[in-house]
Amino acid sequence: AVIYPPADDIFNAMHFTPLSQVKVLILGQDPYHNENQAHGLSFSVLPSQKDIPPSLQNIYQELHDDLGCKVPNNGYLKKWADQGVLLLNTVLTVRAHQANSHQGHGWEQFTDAIIEAVNAQDRPIVYMLWGRPAQSKIPMLTNPKHLILKAPHPSPLSAYRGFFGCRHFSQANEFLKKNGIE
């Protein structure tokens, strides 16, 4: 069976955004399951992909509406990761063309440990939790220095139920700025 992302990319979220650098954690579910899309960062696709996935289009739309950012012409979010945004999925692999096919096979324990390590950081961090699966992690997030932002998932199925207009990006910026983090 073909598995995505390629083996060398599975842990990219942690490589690109080491624990000491995390300012924001955006929690996704599982990787994109078509070829040449997933590369280890939630919501992100490789720069060679001409099509920006619908959820990411909606994230860009909210970013534009909230902060006036220009909508990029690709879906490659490595720049976010390099700036301290941990783009973590709760499950890190998927069988080709089968969404959620690797749920319940052990990745959740691993990614929960990452979430717990972020929760233990004694500095301000923002969590953006979009959709119920991401929000199911809230009981693990006990650090009073951290900001938890919740909204429906940016998928076209739920974006109009409150993802659009959630203003998470400006709230995160204000919180980090207030705490002296650029």
PLM region spans:
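Charged phosphate-binding loop/patch that engages nucleotide di/tri-phosphates or the phosphate backbone
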Residues: 178-182
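A polyanion-binding, active-site-adjacent surface
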Residues: 1-129, 133-136, 141, 147-150, ...
